[in-house]
């Protein structure tokens, strides 16, 4: 459902006539065949960013479903489940991916506070960082300097994944990105008449 004590601003939606635009690229459930047809599947490093004790791992992802890619079916593939839809807004038996858009959340404010503190001499980035980590079932960290900056940026990635922040964050930090290995190389789609990767993953 859409209830959360961490939401600061959430837009109103109501079935059947006042619904939001939806995002189904991560799931695309096919009820007739009981399979998922996602347009995007996270690379292995993305899944590995979440510890098993991190409550977000089994909220943001699922690997209990059958995934069909180019006519082939796979199991034990982690797919993004961050936008499964609110059953109260469904207009049929299966999900329509409808849920109320969350514009501002407390977690983002903690991350902004932590990142801002990194740029203030004597600023305390650890307190908001660890408050968020502990709220997600993780242990507090005790780091400083470059390690603290990395910890804050990694936590921002974990919390806000698949919400559209990543490219802006990388540009703001003047960082690039590296192509990495998929969960299963068989999931790579054919392009340019070849199954050979044009750029090796690292």
Q: Language model features by range: what are they?
A:
Residues 1-25, 35-37, 50-202:
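Acidic/polar-rich alpha-helix caps and helix-coil junctions
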Residues 30-44:
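Short, cationic low-complexity segments
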